[in-house]
Amino acid sequence: MRLNTIKPGAGSKSAGKRVGRGIGSGLGKTCGRGHKGQKSRAGGFHKVGFEGGQMPLQRRLPKRGFVSLTRGRCAEVRLSELAQLPVEDVDLLVLKQAGVIAADALSAKVVLSGAISKKVVLRGIAATAGARAAIEAAGGSCGE
């Protein structure tokens, strides 16, 4: 096989509709658009959401909710995710670089989900009571 001999599979490609090529084609003269009217004209169609002058649905329904500019960006980290990290000292930057938490997270908290058997030292990261106990049982510490 060579790059210049590759072809699409049989029947996978269909030819485009050829319009305006005579009566016998079934798509001659008016090209399948019918006679007169807005939809037969070039560029003749309403914009998306237009309902003929009736108040459109997106304007009939009320606005709802808002985006809080002060929302807390605290990420949740599982014990099982901590166990997979290649380093022992864990801080916010390490978690971001490993892709465990989002890049815009301002803080993180470790929760008791999964198990951990290796020593981990948390720096500047909060932990729930259960997660703290599991980390300390594995020989690690939570220095906040």
From Swiss-Prot:
The annotated region (Disordered) lies at 1-51
Q: Which molecular function GO terms apply here?
A: rRNA binding; structural constituent of ribosome
**Record keywords, A-Z:** Ribonucleoprotein, Ribosomal protein, RNA-binding, rRNA-binding
- Choose any GO biological process term that the UniProt entry carries and state it: translation
Q: What's a single GO CC term here?
A: cytosolic large ribosomal subunit
| Annotated Gly residues bias | 21-31
Q: Which family does it belong to?
A: Belongs to the universal ribosomal protein uL15 family.
Subunit relationships:
Part of the 50S ribosomal subunit.
Q: What does this protein do?
A: Binds to the 23S rRNA.
Protein's recorded name: Large ribosomal subunit protein uL15
Biological source species:
Azoarcus sp. (strain BH72)
